Amino acid sequence: MVAIKSLAILALPVMAMASPLVPRTDSPSQCNNGSLQCCNSSMTQDRGNLQIAQGVLGGLLGGLLGLGGLLDLVDLNALIGVQCSPISIVGNANTCTQQTVCCSNNNFNGLIALGCTPININL
């Protein structure tokens, strides 16, 4: 009886070591508060760029999308991403040859992305 209990106790670690390890396909996220984007270009929102952005994008957003004054609500320390497309860590993160950014859910069909922060993906 003692031999059966001992065998059962010794068998548990052996079975645990024999279990195959499943590799993780996801990596720790650097983009917790938005979406991961690959943008053709990005610009800071300093005074000169902000005036250009308000002129070009403000007119475009106001005229086409009915979102005039949107750039006044954007954090001045964040980036504006231009011509962005969403990427995923698993799928095509290494295919972004331009600027990889994390944008706070302000994507207008890839035209612009507001509230972005640059991130580095090394997979």
UniProtKB/Swiss-Prot annotation:
Disulfide bonds join C31-C102, C38-C96, C39-C84, C103-C116. SMART domains: HYDRO. InterPro entries: Hydrophobin. It is found in: Secreted; Secreted, Cell wall. The keyword Secreted applies. Residues 1-18 form the signal peptide. GO terms for cellular component: extracellular region; fungal-type cell wall. Keywords: Cell wall, Disulfide bond, Glycoprotein, Secreted, Signal. Its main location: secreted. It comes from the Eukaryota. GO terms for molecular function: structural constituent of cell wall. Glycans are attached at N33, N40. Aerial growth, conidiation, and dispersal of filamentous fungi in the environment rely upon a capability of their secreting small amphipathic proteins called hydrophobins (HPBs) with low sequence identity. Class I can self-assemble into an outermost layer of rodlet bundles on aerial cell surfaces, conferring cellular hydrophobicity that supports fungal growth, development and dispersal; whereas Class II form highly ordered films at water-air interfaces through intermolecular interactions but contribute nothing to the rodlet structure. Belongs to the fungal hydrophobin family. Self-assembles to form functional amyloid fibrils called rodlets. Self-assembly into fibrillar rodlets occurs spontaneously at hydrophobic:hydrophilic interfaces and the rodlets further associate laterally to form amphipathic monolayers. This is Class I hydrophobin pri2. It comes from Cyclocybe aegerita.
